[in-house]
Amino acid sequence: MKEVIDTVGRRKTSVARVFMTPGKGRVIINKLPVEEYFRDEVKRLHALRPLVLTEKTEDFDIKVNVKGGGLSGQSGAVSLGIARALTEFDEAARAVLKQERLLTRDPRMVERKKFGRKKARKSFQFSKR
């Protein structure tokens, strides 16, 4: 077994590189504790969901470098990266994570703005006369 498990998670325009080692349960994101980086509890819980579901919150030290996008996309990227790292470590966790759809990259991206319109779908006001 490898000492350090290195995986990548992506969501929207965010990319998270996850480095997982056996340890005491410390999670560091961009050199900050997870509580400081994701101050919003919902985003923090979303990022750490794979650890909670597999009941391995105290078994690993996780170091994450994440860049791009906003906090919502970053928490999704971190979640996918952690889920992929857990499956590399323990194949039994794969079934639980797959059932919760945590191993699937979310394909939803921002729709591009079209010319002749205000935004992707919103048009300028239409006047019949």
From Swiss-Prot:
Belongs to the universal ribosomal protein uS9 family. It comes from the Bacteria. It holds the Pfam family Ribosomal_S9. PROSITE patterns: RIBOSOMAL_S9. This is Small ribosomal subunit protein uS9. One of its GO terms (biological process) is translation. HAMAP family: Ribosomal_uS9_B (MF_00532_B). GO terms for molecular function: RNA binding; structural constituent of ribosome. Signal peptide: none annotated. PANTHER family: RIBOSOMAL PROTEIN S9, SMALL RIBOSOMAL SUBUNIT PROTEIN US9M.
